[in-house]
Amino acid sequence: MPFAEKKRRTYENAVKPLRKSRIYAPFRSIGHVSNAVPFDIEARGTHFLVTTSVGNTFQTYDCEKLNLLFVGKQLDKEITCLKSFKDFMLVAAGSKIFAYKRGKIIWDIDVEQEHGTVTHLDAFGEWIIACTSSRHVYVWKHASKYSVPELHTTFLPNTNADITSLLHPSTYLNKILLGFSDGALQIWNLRVSKRVHEFQEFFGDGITSLTQAPVLDVLAVGTISGRIVIFNLKNGSILMEFKQDGQVLSCSFRTDGTPILASSNPIGDLSFWDLSKRRIQNVTYNAHFGSLPKIQFLNGQPILVTAGPDNSLKEWIFDSMDGAPRILRSRNGHYEPPSFVKFYGKSVHFLISAATDRSLRAVSLYQDSQSTELSQGSVISKAKKLNVRPEELKLPEITALSSSNTREKYWDNVLTAHKNDSSARTWNWKSKTLGQHVLPTSDGTSVRSVCVSCCGNFGLIGSSKGVVDVYNMQSGIKRKSFGQSSLSGKPVTAVMLDNVNRILVTASLDGILKFWDFNKGNLIDSLDVGSSITHAIYQHSSDLVAVACDDFGIRIVDVQTRKIVRELWGHSNRLTSFDFSDTGRWLVTASLDGTIRTWDLPTGHLIDSISTPSVCTSLTFAPTGDYLATTHVDQVGISLWTNLSMFKHVSTKALRLDDVVEVSAPSVSGEKGISVVEAALNVESNAEDEEDISYRTMDQLDPNLQTLSKLPRTQWQTLINLEAIKARNAPKEVPKVPEKAPFFLPSLKDQSEATVPKQPIATEISKPTAVASIKVSGTEFSTLLHGNDDDAFFEYLKSLGPAKIDLEIRSLDAYPPYEEFILFINIMTRRLSKRRDFELVQACMSVFTKSHEDVLLMHDTPEDTVPVFESLKAWESVHKEENQRLLDLVGYCSGILSFMRT
């Protein structure tokens, strides 16, 4: 079929539009630590808790080990302020303030929407204060922890300058300080809503931060010009003044007895000032990648906590002789959106992710503290010596990655290609460090693709001019090269090797897929797919290669036959990533058109299509099939989606190409998401899939096909051999009579004789009369046998056990005129002629002939047995005909198979 027709292909049996995704449900987003919103530290006795904002929710860590304690409930808008207050965590988002307790919302208050969003938040005593973007100040009074705060007052300072900082000075009853962008500092009384005093001439520049000193009436005022003013609030005098590079974003006083003041600037530097000597002590450059909106010393400890929009939270300890801090512990993630993600190994414990921030990270799905960045050496110390930023000394951005966990304990097992770099780098996963080998291309051009063999011994790199070099991962020695004799001059966009290192598959931008003998090094075959290949992946369990092309199509190639077996069309823009499912049955693709589509490869149908808020840049399917992990252009985290097909039936009916479901991305808290346990216990089905789920297999596909009863094999085998089984299970010895008990202990025999009354001996009745009395009531077996519904009879027969069926057959009326014999033989003959329940019919007739053989042969008069023998002859005729038909078919198939084997 021409490509144009395939692009226009529609499915006549496509179902109606979906309301939600069939396969995927958002689970949670991982890899988030902090953003530009200032954090909050809460003292709980001798322990400290630090809370950071991550978009629409917050995370709380224990400062002792930086373990993640809990995540707050997701909000509709992004968080702007955090403040701990009594047992609550106050969170401002938009025009509302929410009170959380252990991650759950207890109550909320709000400001008028026309006054803008909340920009500053503070709380002390019974007061809660919020400043808005329109310079309005709201004051609430919180009477008790069980009540919702009541609005006390609202006031608007008489100035056109914006409020830039808010602080409650210690011991100043009902007072707050407001810092403004024009350099003014005002004291306000909350109870009467009046300005008490204003300091205008002391600072000049706009105030950016206010920090309370350990000494009463003293605070540090930071300005936009970099001035740090130590100001006495009581007498309105400047005690000392410092000047740093860049504006002052935050200040903090050390409270363990050492007179040190720390300050931060927008480029991530930390400055430490000796207050006793009134000079700078040292500067820590590039403490963070980007600004530091807040820094704070832990009360009474030489530990400084910092966090910023570089998605990192750090604790610095001052234990060196020169007073310079060192990192005590930290939690961090990518500070730029990841561009590549892949599950490591055969489990879902770790993800490997790479981003444009030039870092390679191991992200744990089990515990946040296990996530770490793979070290690139002493980058920070080298940056200090060269006076450059650390990211400038890191390796270029990673463009391709491959790994194998087979030899991870012995040598490097991760291989990466870097942007505009002519060498690939090895990494050691066990030590989480950069490896010792640098693998250059033989033609000197940049590396475009990499591959690590399944055995972990070989690393393959594809160059920009069509050459593939093979290196030993243990020694870093080059072993062979492919492509010099048939140099295409086009970049090798994918290098793939099968499980046993027998066939090497390469893809290039000229649209040629080449198959090489890996051991001999010669070209076996090549396949032109008709369009430039941008990427390709190998599915080892099924020997399939998926190829993404410039014409927005995906081709599925069988490595054994070297032919295109499927072509998938539906994306309207370039493909960014794709991956096979764990079973190889599905292919999940992502494109710049904003959709993630799932294709069923056996049928070639589109079975799921979702649209995410931002474009997916990379995706990977879990080796266990539990999750789908995705990265997006505007998110520093990694999104996890639960695979619902692990816990319920998923319809594979074709969808229309324009049937796309808009879904929300997974949240950090997992709010409105479906976990693996929830998916297993409570999963709702789509309405359009109910019909497909309730489908039942037909009783018989075709009248010419022999159909079995679908009973377990042991059931009809036991029925045939029931007498032998009973004989085998019979006791070999006669039960022994128990010894006579002492005279003072009654025996069981005595008890039974004493308790069970003797029944009168019944008078002997004739055998025909006894049988007649039994047949009066009848059984369900006998009732259905006398009826006209063969299907109902066999359904009841299938519900019985082997012993019950044997008993019912033996209980057939064995006296002239043998009516039940005739009915039983006839119903079995009709069932056999319909070619249904073949093995059950054979087993029942075998039991019937064995059980009643003596009755059929020892008859009284010929007239009584004529109808029975006529029924048996009819059975014999049908039985011989059907057996001969089956023998002919089996013989034919056996002959064909023997011919094909030879």
UniProtKB/Swiss-Prot annotation:
Localisation per UniProt entry: Nucleus, Nucleolus
Gene3D superfamilies (alphabetical): YVTN repeat-like/Quinoprotein amine dehydrogenase
Gene Ontology, cellular component aspect: cell division site; cytosol; mitotic spindle; nucleus; Pwp2p-containing subcomplex of 90S preribosome; small-subunit processome
Coiled coil: none
Protein keywords: Nucleus, Repeat, Ribonucleoprotein, Ribosome biogenesis, WD repeat
GO BP annotation list: rRNA processing
Described purpose of this protein according to its UniProt entry: Involved in nucleolar processing of pre-18S ribosomal RNA and ribosome assembly.
Annotated domain remarks: The WD repeats are grouped into two tandem seven-bladed beta-propeller regions.
UniProt protein name: U3 small nucleolar RNA-associated protein 21 homolog
Organism listed in the record: Schizosaccharomyces pombe (strain 972 / ATCC 24843) (Fission yeast)
